[in-house]
Amino acid sequence: MFHLFRLSGSAIAEMKQPFIKTEGQGKRVTAEIIEEIRSKLRPGDIFITRHDDAMSNLFLPGFWPHAALYIGPLSNRDDLGLPTYRDHSADVLEAKKDGVKLREVEETLSVDSFVILRPKISTAELDQALEKALTHEGKHYDFAFDFRKAERLCCTELVYRAFHGIGQWNLKLIKQSGHFALPAEELIRQGMQKGLVDVAMIFGVDGDTVEIGKKAQDLLLSTLKD
């Protein structure tokens, strides 16, 4: 099925599964939820997200199919002593079918579930990771999920190329459908097993409240396949 998704590309990205949601039912992450977590976000946070009714859920492995990188607003970057990069209102770098672009948090979190992973790296290492990530802005989306090349990037490849080789970050690609890649669930698993990330918060796994701390970690673990 993963191979079929590679071939179908953007067509499947647009499709929704029938009967998962009632007609007119919106996303479970509301504007109120986004405002609740906004002040808790930090530059370098990794967003892992899910749409309950996405057709791609049938083709991509695991509960969590998508990833994005939070760059942060100018004020947060100043507080951490990070470069401002550019005066831009968007603060998430995300690879979607229309390419690698800076986007508003509201767009990235227009989803049903999310988990926020916080990399355990120094400020200098974080600066390096964000600088690397932003070099990929404007590239096309990689519907082939080919991690051997950087001309086009899929969502998790953007995160992989931002952090891999910085500090203790050494993520192992896994073989799927004859090629090496890093699905979002594998990114989560390796990040937790190697102690590279903390689970900052989670939403949409067990109810519609934002959970933090150990409960957030336990809920995330409950979604991962053995």
Q: Which residues make up each language-model segment?
A:
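Cysteine-nucleophile amide-bond enzymes
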Residues: 1-226
